[in-house]
Regions:
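His/Asp/Glu-rich metal-coordinating catalytic cores
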Residues: 2-185
Length: 187
């Protein structure tokens, strides 16, 4: 849940109100964004776990957690008579992630694969490269040397909704006995 992915919500929700199906984390991001922009539109949320199933308008929707730099992101598969229509935003499969908010639910995806897939809509950047991609969501290997070498302050600019990266920075601060001060337009 990044604000650039939901920017249109404030423009059309009044004209086409419907429940916003999301995780608790995404609900918080949406509410924060609307409060920051002083938009007082009453929103209806349907909060779900990242891996779950729901019936909407007579169709079965299956949600499965993916790994992304936004916590509890998910893809969705919609059952149809011809097979599943599957949508995922950008994600990676990182088997080393131990934080529950960022674990790819391979088991849920495996269960979905037991039915035919009629249409797959997924990011494909880098699909033409063999092997594995680098976990681009990790910043620790790139900046930890600055923490161990710094005698004074370190300033870091980071996207406020990238909680994976923020948690890495907090961990580095704790490991290197650095004080933390957060600043953004909300503080």
């Amino acid at each position: 849940a990044h604000d650039e992915n939901m920017g249109a919500l404030k423009y059309f929700y009044d004209d086409a109100p419907a429940p916003i199906i999301c995780t608790r984390f995404t609900k918080h991001v949406i509410e924060t964004q609307f409060n920051f922009n002083t938009l007082r539109i009453p929103l209806e949320f349907k909060v779900i776990p990242p891996t779950s199933a729901l019936e909407i308008a007579g169709r079965k929707f299956h949600f499965f957690q993916t790994s992304h730099n936004a916590a509890y992101s998910f893809g969705v598969a919609i059952e149809t008579s011809k097979g599943n229509i599957v949508y995922t935003s950008d994600f990676i499969v990182d088997y080393s992630v131990k934080i529950p908010a960022y674990i790819f639910d391979m088991k849920a995806l495996s269960v979905l694969s037991e039915r035919p897939t009629f249409l797959l809509m997924s990011e494909s950047k880098g699909a033409n490269h063999e092997g594995y991609c680098s976990p681009h969501h990790r910043v620790t290997p790139l900046i930890e040397k600055y923490f161990s070498n710094a005698n004074k302050r370190i300033f870091i600019d980071c996207f406020w909704q990238n909680f994976f990266r923020i948690s890495e920075i907090i961990d580095l601060c704790i490991e290197n006995n650095k004080k933390i001060f957060f600043y953004n337009d909300f503080t």
